[in-house]
């Protein structure tokens, strides 16, 4: 277009005339330029000039302050959409110039100005919204230039998406743009620390797009990792991954729980757990970010579990279900990441051994060890349950109906007995103590060895915990004479199951001076492969 035409265009945008005839010439010129931008060579040539992007920006700047009450809105919107289409097409060839002059931000502000006026049809607004998303996506394919002073416009633009959630095309355009803008650490930080993020992440993404338009919720419930995902679901998981691996995600989760309650908090946690536990590749920054907020929640829920047991028999007693659900998810994430040395070092450096043993001890003292005797024919005090043998932490058989009913109902273990949680804790101790003498010593000094040994039994509350404990004991004793001496003294008091030691690769010997000591017994040791296979059954 010539300079005169740009001048005419700018005047038209500024004046917003009511006569539809005044728009015809400019609309025809825009259509011609749009056609040119669809031809690759011509598009590349036009996009190489800074001038056209400055002219497009000037159009948007003028348009932001225009009152459209007297305008011929249908024709005016054709002009606006034409300008955005030209920018969208040109940004395929050049992303640097439009970002450097903050053209995406200017277009967002222009859209928001138009959306606040009542003269435009819903259809026109929806089309314009989608075009702005497409343009912004093109601009940010390789790099993101984010101006924090424009965050409010970005937030308002994201919230606008709630108006168009029924349109699949707009949903896809929005999702692609959002996945790109999430490359900006500054953008994510601003988002996660803003109360309005609840509306964007929980209401729009989780309960809107993800719940209504993807199979992600079904994937979480069915735990089917082989299920094929739609392209939209893949994009949504990419967005969530960018959020989860940011250091501010923990702050968002606390706000979510406080403002929207447990249901929303737990829904997010379930999806996040599925995402983290099914992903194999993390860089050090991502691991650190996930561990940071996850470990904080783990520590908080250790305190809450302790408080739960202390108040269990009082009028202030709370429901264990929410505690168990979140604790299971947190520990699922931690044990999944614990295979990485960086994660092990992180947990060790943040007093992880002490924190894990603290929760282990709380559960050991308050939860029952349960064995369902399905073929014994014995009668249980709770007639609704199958025959069961339940013992406390010192081995006393529990027959009190009130106590049993708190922990077992209809042949199912209640959440108040925190089923499976100790398995996670033993796995974490195993990961952290492998070839780490300082950790091995810490476990002994914190009385963790006794906890692990006392769980080398069949316990339906913690399936295959015996096998996990054997693996853990093997790691705790390896090349650690002090721990071996400690175990040998327990063995002398008949406090250790000899079969457990044998499977762990040790046996008790008496030397020439009559001293009891442990020696390696690899010939009778159970293979780790077999123990892991038993655990994974």
Swiss-Prot record:
Pfam families found in the cross-reference section:
Atx10homo_assoc
Q: What is this protein called?
A: Ataxin-10 homolog
Q: Which cell locations does it reside in?
A: Cytoplasm
The record's Gene Ontology cellular component field reads: cytosol
Its main subcellular localisation, reduced to a broad class, is cytoplasm
Recite the UniProt keywords alphabetically.
Answer: Cell cycle, Cell division, Cytoplasm
What task does this protein carry out? Answer: May play a role in the regulation of cytokinesis.
Q: Which GO terms describe its biological process?
A: cell division
InterPro entries noted in UniProt: ARM-type_fold, Ataxin-10/CTR86_families, Ataxin-10_domain
Identify its protein family: Belongs to the ataxin-10 family.
């Amino acid at each position: 277009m010539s300079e005169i035409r740009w001048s005419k265009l700018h005047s038209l945008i500024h004046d917003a005339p009511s006569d539809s005839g005044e728009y015809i010439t400019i609309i025809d010129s825009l259509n011609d330029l749009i056609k040119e931008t669809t031809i690759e060579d011509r598009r590349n040539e036009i996009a190489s000039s800074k001038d056209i992007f400055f002219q497009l920006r000037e159009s948007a700047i003028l348009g932001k302050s225009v009152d459209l009450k007297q305008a011929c809105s249908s024709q005016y919107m054709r002009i606006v959409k034409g300008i955005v289409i030209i920018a969208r097409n040109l940004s395929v060839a050049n992303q640097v110039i439009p970002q450097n002059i903050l053209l995406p931000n200017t277009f967002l502000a222009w859209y928001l100005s138009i959306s606040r006026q009542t003269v435009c049809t819903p259809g026109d607004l929806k089309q314009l919204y989608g075009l702005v998303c497409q343009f912004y996506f093109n601009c940010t394919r390789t790099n993101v230039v984010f101006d924090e002073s424009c965050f409010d416009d970005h937030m308002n633009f994201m919230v606008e998406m709630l108006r168009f959630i029924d349109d699949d095309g707009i949903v896809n355009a929005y999702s692609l743009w959002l996945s790109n803008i999430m490359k900006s650490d500054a953008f994510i930080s601003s988002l996660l620390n803003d109360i309005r993020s609840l509306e964007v992440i929980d209401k729009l993404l989780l309960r809107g797009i993800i719940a209504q338009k993807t199979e992600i919720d079904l994937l979480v419930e069915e735990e089917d990792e082989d299920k094929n995902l739609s392209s939209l679901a893949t994009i949504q998981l990419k967005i969530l991954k960018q959020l989860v691996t940011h250091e501010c995600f923990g702050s968002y989760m606390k706000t979510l729980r406080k403002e929207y309650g447990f249901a929303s908090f737990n829904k997010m946690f379930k999806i996040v757990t599925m995402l983290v536990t099914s992903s194999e590749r993390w860089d050090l920054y991502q691991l650190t970010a996930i561990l940071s907020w996850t470990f904080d929640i783990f520590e908080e829920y250790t305190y809450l579990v302790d408080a739960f047991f202390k108040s269990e028999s009082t009028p202030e007693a709370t429901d264990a279900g929410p505690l168990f659900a979140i604790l299971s998810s947190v520990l699922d994430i931690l044990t999944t990441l614990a295979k990485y040395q960086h994660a092990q070092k992180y947990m060790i450096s943040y007093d992880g051994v002490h924190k894990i043993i603290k929760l282990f001890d709380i559960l050991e003292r308050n939860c029952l060890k349960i064995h369902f005797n399905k073929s014994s024919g014995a009668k249980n005090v709770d007639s609704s349950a199958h025959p069961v043998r339940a013992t406390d932490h010192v081995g006393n058989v529990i027959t009190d109906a009130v106590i049993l009913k708190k922990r077992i109902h209809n042949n199912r273990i209640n959440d108040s007995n925190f089923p499976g949680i100790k398995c996670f804790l033993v796995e974490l101790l195993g990961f952290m103590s492998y070839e780490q003498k300082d950790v091995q010593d810490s476990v002994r000094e914190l009385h963790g060895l006794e906890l692990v040994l006392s769980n080398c039994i069949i316990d339906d509350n913690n399936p295959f915990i015996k096998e996990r404990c054997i693996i853990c004991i093997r790691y705790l004793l390896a090349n650690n004479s002090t721990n071996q001496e400690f175990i040998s003294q327990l063995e002398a008091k008949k406090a250790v199951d000899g079969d457990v030691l044998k499977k762990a690769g040790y046996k008790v010997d008496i030397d020439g001076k009559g001293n009891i000591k442990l020696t390696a017994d690899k010939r009778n040791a159970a293979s780790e492969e077999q123990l892991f296979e038993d655990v994974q059954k």
